[in-house]
Amino acid sequence: MSVQILGKGKKVALKRRHARLRKHISGTPELPRLVVTRSNRHMVAQIIDDTKGVTLVSESTLTSDFAGFEGTKTEAAKKVGELIAKKAQDAGITAVVFDRGGNKYHGRVAAVAEGAREGGLAL
């Protein structure tokens, strides 16, 4: 199954990279997928079971856990990783497949992964 995404620009390149990644990465009930979505202001992390098409756990900088949070965007991303690891362990999830969503494994995306590892989640 090949996905053809045509065009130029950052958003198109991001979608092309993500489509390439998704050919190899998929979440199962035993090993769900940790998806990281990055915007200019916020970070969203979701743990997804692709066989059922269900989001098992999610965490974001938009949730009430971040009310009054003061720090850099990278520190917030690390906290998102720690919080999703805690929620995953409460749901009985110990290991996941990391899906960087076409973004480089650098900066805030890497901070989410680092926070999840420190929270006890195996990537």
UniProtKB/Swiss-Prot annotation:
The molecule here is called Large ribosomal subunit protein uL18
What transmembrane ranges does the database entry give? Answer: none
What protein family does this chain belong to? Belongs to the universal ribosomal protein uL18 family.
User: What task does this protein carry out?
Assistant: This is one of the proteins that bind and probably mediate the attachment of the 5S RNA into the large ribosomal subunit, where it forms part of the central protuberance.
Q: Which GO terms describe its biological process?
A: translation
Keyword terms, alphabetized: Ribonucleoprotein, Ribosomal protein, RNA-binding, rRNA-binding
GO: which molecular function terms? Answer: 5S rRNA binding; structural constituent of ribosome
Quaternary context? Part of the 50S ribosomal subunit; part of the 5S rRNA/L5/L18/L25 subcomplex. Contacts the 5S and 23S rRNAs.
Matching NCBIfam families: L18_bact
Under the heading Pfam families, the entry gives: Ribosomal_L18p
Example GO CC term: the record gives: cytosolic large ribosomal subunit
Against Gene3D superfamilies, the record matches this protein to: 3.30.420.100
Per the record, the domain of life is Bacteria
Instruction: Report which residue ranges the record marks as coiled coil.
Output: none
